[in-house]
Every structure is written in C-alpha cells, then in structure tokens.
C-alpha cells in the first residue's frame, strides 16, 4: 500500500531516500505511523 499514490515515481524515490535518512542510526527521529490500515 502506498501512502502517496498521487506522486510520481521520482517523488516517491525522493521520499523513500529521505525516509531512510531519517531512520538511519544516529540520524533524525524514529517515527511509527500507525494511523493507516
């Protein structure tokens, strides 16, 4: 399931890259979105 079905593949990739940076060890914050599903 995609949270942003209206985004282009390029935008999805950019968000994915950002998300991985956010959850990387020692970087950013750990966020768990349980509002879907």
Swiss-Prot record:
Xref: Pfam families: Glycolytic
Entry-linked Gene3D superfamilies: Aldolase class I
GO molecular function, one term: fructose-bisphosphate aldolase activity
Catalytic activities: beta-D-fructose 1,6-bisphosphate = D-glyceraldehyde 3-phosphate + dihydroxyacetone phosphate
EC number of this enzyme: 4.1.2.13
Pathway stated in the Swiss-Prot or TrEMBL entry: Carbohydrate degradation; glycolysis; D-glyceraldehyde 3-phosphate and glycerone phosphate from D-glucose: step 4/4
UniProt record, GO biological process: glycolytic process
Protein name (record): Fructose-bisphosphate aldolase A
Taxonomic source organism: Thunnus albacares
Gene name per UniProt: ALDOA
